[in-house]
Amino acid sequence: MQSNQAEMGPGSGPEIERRLRGWAAGKGPLHVRLAAALKAAIERGDVLPGTRLPPERRLAKALSVGRSTVVAAYASLAKQGLVARRQGSGTWVEPVGDYARGRAGELATRAQHRLFAVSSFDERHGAISLFAATPDSVAAVGELSAQAAEEIDRVSEHHGYWPLGYPPLRQEIAKRLTARGLRTAEAEVLVTTGAQQAIALTAAAFVGPGEFVVLEDPTYPGAIDAYRQTGARILSAPVGPTGIDLDLVREVLARADVKLIYATPSFQNPTSALMPIGERHRLAQLASDHGTLVVEDEAHAELAFDAAAPPPIAAFADGASVVTIGSLSKVFWGGLRVGWIRAPQPVLSHLGRLKAVFDLGSSLPSQVLAALLLQRADEIIPIRIEELRSRSALLGSLVSTHLPGWSFAEPAGGLVLWTKLPHGSASELAEVARANGALILPGSMTSPSDWFDDHVRLPYVARPEVLEQGVRRLARAWQAYCGQDTRREREVGVIG
């Protein structure tokens, strides 16, 4: 890792402000706000371990505050174990230790806990879920169930354990990837229990406590949980119209020993960004140059409304620098719980041994059904895409009609609409929405840096009548929330 003796940027006001990102907008005394902003910058990796923070007087001048404010902020960070104050040497960001592992344990699985909570609430109280991007089943799931039962009966004399996956399913996945431009053999495919297990396996196999991982910001919440669970230090990179910001990734790779980059190049969750071929080439080259592993999540790749997504990043990589993961749950049925990992055989063998420790192999009946579905994929997927295209247009129209201040870009594929609030907090709105019978995912839950609390991720996977009723409930919640905001502003005005 580079820059172990480097100060936090050149010490200029604009550079520090960029790293602290609007620190003064918080609540409480100035030194509390500054400490919170510095803590967040350290946790998201904008300020790396071993970095010397600016001298108190210089930072005070750059931020237009008193020196005592910076002194108090640094003291607070030292008390939390985030920095060390060295006599005559300044204030330094501490290496990863017990604090980071504790923080990982505290924050891990928050999205899963939230999902379990809202699912339970949904069942008990009849709330409409606009929370999870889990589609209902295609008709072929029911149609092929009898044929799957016959196949299961045929193989029932076998013990049923295939740690790497049911061979016919591995063959079908390999064919599908090859057709998408990534030449793949059956021996390079590992079947997993959904893409979530695939992500968790890469985290367990390749990342240890204190090691650096780059995640998109925003990104799939389950990926944040999986990599936090390892005790990794997460460095966030913003997502634009063409995917993860590769200029920033290049800078991060130059100054930190990054173990792994997680990216969703095809209809990114939640922004629906699509990475073009040139950027895929570039990311593969960056990973190869720096000896960093790319884990690309292709769960939404086949859900293009118009032009097909480019080939996976692994198609442009040499050697073992890219691992590709995917899911059949997003295409055929959320309850199918079948995912996969594609990697060079030596890497796959390592992942397969690790998966065997977890479960000895995924459910055979689901795999048998998945293989039959893939055999008819060219017939089934266009039907699913037309359904999603229609529901995406409907959801966009509903949001524009009932929530006219909310903004969004029309997705070209995938499963979700990434909406921006005109003001306020999506986390606070989520509580009001729940009271009004609608469950939503605040944007902050998609962010490893806890940003995007002014966004809401809205899936368009539900039936049209459910989408319409859900948005109407959300609109009532938004009106109620805006009324609360107005009352708070008036109370603050009176106090002032």
Feature-to-residue mapping (PLM):
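N-terminal basic, amphipathic alpha-helical segments
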Residues: 1-150, 352, 356-362, 372, ...
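Short beta-strand "wing" residues that participate in macromolecule-binding interfaces
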Residues: 84-85, 184, 440
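Conserved glycine-rich beta-strand-loop-beta hairpin in the small C-terminal domain of fold type I
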Residues: 371, 388-396, 406-420
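Conserved PLP-binding active-site segment of the aspartate aminotransferase-like
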Residues: 65, 343, 418-423, 440-479
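Active-site PLP attachment segment
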Residues: 88, 315-350, 362-365, 454
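Structural signature of PLP-dependent enzymes
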Residues: 157, 351-358, 374-396
